[in-house]
Amino acid sequence: MIKSAQETCSILVVENSDDFRAGLAHELHQLGHTVTVASERREAMGLEDRAQFDLLVSDLVNQASATEPEIVRSFKMAATGSQSRRAIAELHVIIEKILSFKLRRIDVAQPTDQIREKIELELPSNLTLMNGVLEYLVDRVARLGLIKVEQSNLFVALDEAFVNAVKHGNRNDTTKLLRITAELSAHEAIFTVEDEGEGFDVCEIPDPRDSANLFKSSGRGVLLIYNIMDEVEYSERGTRLRMVKRPEGLRP
């Protein structure tokens, strides 16, 4: 079903692979959206009215340093604040469609230990957008052999990190963005979650590993993150959280 003009989004796809670019544009057209494509960043920067776009989907592959066996496909999605206020439900559908399309395209037979993938997402602070992102990230980590989905609580840790950033960092303000970065390989998965909130004094966080704090309701999410992840680090201002997950055999 074609969406009405009021619900139609303007999407810019920047991708150097002809097949991937055409396929993704077709998928988004099928949802009823207006899609503009560019084969490289320089071409995209030459567009006259770049402010018209509600969503950007861009590859992040550095052709000078990456070869096909070493990197599958890195990409970035960024949504504007105006789009989040206008049609947050439609943005949810678009993001899940892009992630689903990418998942179908990149699963090719390659030695797992040579695959490296980087994902960057910029999303409005709305929790309804997060489930598809969570499922996608956990699936990618599982396919690289870092975890077994049925035995892992990685989904829980990432969910707690996203919820904390949206609710406590950005205070559910959809005009503020949540930035999520995932750097994935067969050896480790590094996740960074950054909000646009005012921050907080990291030193004031009760140590969730201290037995005196185990039964306190506050900080329960932080406790889960510390228990599930192998490394957890907050930035000095408290607006960025870095988490590392490794397979059992590679843990320090």
State the predicted function of each range:
Residues 159, 163, 167:
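Short alpha-helix lining the ATP-binding pocket of the histidine-kinase-like ATPase
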